[in-house]
């Protein structure tokens, strides 16, 4: 869906005379979102995901299509994930990652991930949602089927965790408090 020629022309018309690659990229996203059509919103989602991938490649030296082993060790070696929290690498995780990777997220989900939940390095997010969700599952459940089940459910939007869990588990932070009010209709 979406007409790339139309996006390119509309982007070109909106750009100032001098623009950086990042300006062009953001303008393409804006053009897509201004269409207010799901097919263009999904193109914007791919562009937003590309920004996260570029951050990973630039700051961690690994992309989201590398083996999960390469991704995992880059996250540990660059201090993005906590070595004391993460279990020892298991080759089985390659199939887990390949299973969750094809899940396409909507634009708002990718933006929310990048803004609120992705771990940052030098002030920019350096995890795609899929990689971060694998880290959350592994950090919380270790090398178990529960880790995969949680990662998959998170990517598919079937489970929601409080922000401290989404932010902290991969870094070894299990002490952050999240507040919520739950009412059950009782008088206690």
Predicted region positions:
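Extended catalytic cores of very large enzyme megasubunits
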Residues: 1-188
